[in-house]
Amino acid sequence: MNDSLKAQCVAEFLGTGLFLFFGIGCLCALKLAGASLGLWEICIIWGLGISLAVYLTAGISGAHLNPAVTIALWLFAAFPGRKVLPFCVAQLAGAFGGAVLAYFLYSNLFIDFESAHNMVRGSAESLQLASIFSTYPAAALNI
């Protein structure tokens, strides 16, 4: 791996991490700290996160910030195949890094929220907090 590719992968890692840190941090504040954020504010914060990430990484790596974007660009011959795997690995690692950082900063509030609401991790009730990091169908929906 040459220095240019390393720099691009570091940019993708940091950009993806920054993007998800902003968004997940916003959702943590909403659900755990009682922040009174409406849909408008949440969208603005996510938008600010992606805008900063794109601004910081576009000149270095092209600001893909998502494996789906990298793979789509490769499939349509706008991105070299030898960079796909390193970019995707960097993006996935950055996503986990951003999520872990947000979890670490709010970890005490996670524990307090679980205690106050008698939640057991892995139970159906815990999906309320798990939905900060991922999406799940509503419990009332059936297939």
Predicted regions and their residues:
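Membrane-interface helix-loop junctions and terminal tails of multi-pass membrane proteins
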Residues: 1-143
